[in-house]
């Protein structure tokens, strides 16, 4: 099957998920993106796990039904297989989509569906969370039926539709394409949340084409770069820093990010997983970079090899202006902090603070 066909089928899947959320009354609501992103992530994790399982145990690739072959596998052998699958989110047998699909007509299916998502997060709890600036952890897999108002029949029907949406095809043929495929798909996934007409993501997203150009300017293809750190202090959905990581080589660098938005941080986690960068998940921080910069070495702010950023240009930060003036890290705001205007505080030049933070965070 050609990559173009897989790409179109993936876009069709995203459209089906959006249709399902719209039909249940979640269209253009705050919960729409949660359902779409989490369900898409679940589908990706399922297919990625199967892809890696076949590579780990070649006999699975020859099985008439790989899911039945996995179900017959003794638990001890299944666990050994999972241990050998590096940089892959582990799924138990009962987490796989066909297992849920077989039970979709049960009276408590919504409860089962939600429990599966939470169990996946629990199984991978060491990496499957967003860390807040105050050290609290936020799971990126949450119960989805809870966003639906109504009784159990309505919730069951909604979760059944989601399973039906994701069960019709496989991502497997796309994994070899890697970044070139999934960067395009990610852009399509969030396009409805990247508009000024009612969307909330315009400030969080940099187009893939621009991100790629910036990455190529920073790292020449002839350079042999290894074991470096990449940082984005206003990461949004991660397009800039992931393009940079791809230019360097995903396994040759570690990504560090911070962003004040919980929504964009969730999207960033998905973006890292899609692009085989699960090793950087624990460095995704949700919080105010200027007021509470998180990444440190000892008592000092960490310095990074590469930094990319598309920070907000003008924003009202009068509420924590005094905190920045009394900044603990002496010399971070070496050029000063813009004054609070008498009028139009929304026009405060916050980009000047971010620019100084960038320079302070860059290795000599």
Predicted regions and their residues:
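Amphipathic alpha-helical transducer elements in NTP-driven molecular machines
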Residues: 7, 11, 262-266, 301-305, ...
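A short, mixed-charge helix-start or loop-turn motif at secondary-structure junctions
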Residues: 196, 254, 337-341
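Mobile active-site "lid"/loop adjacent to the S-adenosyl-L-methionine
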Residues: 313-353
């Amino acid at each position: 099957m050609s990559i173009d066909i897989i790409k179109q089928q993936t876009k069709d899947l995203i459209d089906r998920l959006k249709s399902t959320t719209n039909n249940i009354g979640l269209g253009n609501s705050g919960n729409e993106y949660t359902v779409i992103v989490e369900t898409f992530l679940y589908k990706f994790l399922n297919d990625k796990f199967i892809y890696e399982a076949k590579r780990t145990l070649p006999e699975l690739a020859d099985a008439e039904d790989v899911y039945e072959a996995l179900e017959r596998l003794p638990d001890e052998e299944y666990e050994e297989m999972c241990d050998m699958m590096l940089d892959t989110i582990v799924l138990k047998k009962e987490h796989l989509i066909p297992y849920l699909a077989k039970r979709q007509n049960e009276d408590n299916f919504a409860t089962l569906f939600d429990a599966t998502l939470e169990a996946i997060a629990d199984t991978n709890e060491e990496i499957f969370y967003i860390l807040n600036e105050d050290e609290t952890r936020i799971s990126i897999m949450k119960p989805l039926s809870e966003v639906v108002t109504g009784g159990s029949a309505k919730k069951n029907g909604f979760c059944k539709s989601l399973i039906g949406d994701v069960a019709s095809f496989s991502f497997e043929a796309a994994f070899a394409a890697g970044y070139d495929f999934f960067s395009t798909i990610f852009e399509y996934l969030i396009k409805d949340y990247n508009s000024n007409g009612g969307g909330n993501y315009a400030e969080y997203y940099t187009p893939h084409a621009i991100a790629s150009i910036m990455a190529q300017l920073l790292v020449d293809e002839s350079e042999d770069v290894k074991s470096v750190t990449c940082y984005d202090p206003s990461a949004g959905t991660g397009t800039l820093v992931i393009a940079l990581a791809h230019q360097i080589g995903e396994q040759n660098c570690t990504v560090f990010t911070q962003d004040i938005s919980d929504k964009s941080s969730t999207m960033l986690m998905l973006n890292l997983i899609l692009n085989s960068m699960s090793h950087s998940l624990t460095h995704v921080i949700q919080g105010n970079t200027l007021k509470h910069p998180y990444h440190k070495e000892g008592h000092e702010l960490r310095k990074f090899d590469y930094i990319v950023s598309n920070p907000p240009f003008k924003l009202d930060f009068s509420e924590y202006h005094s905190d920045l003036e009394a900044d603990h890290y002496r010399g971070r705001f070496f050029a000063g902090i813009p004054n609070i205007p008498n009028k139009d505080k929304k026009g405060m030049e916050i980009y000047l603070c971010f620019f100084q933070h960038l320079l302070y965070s860059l290795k000599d």
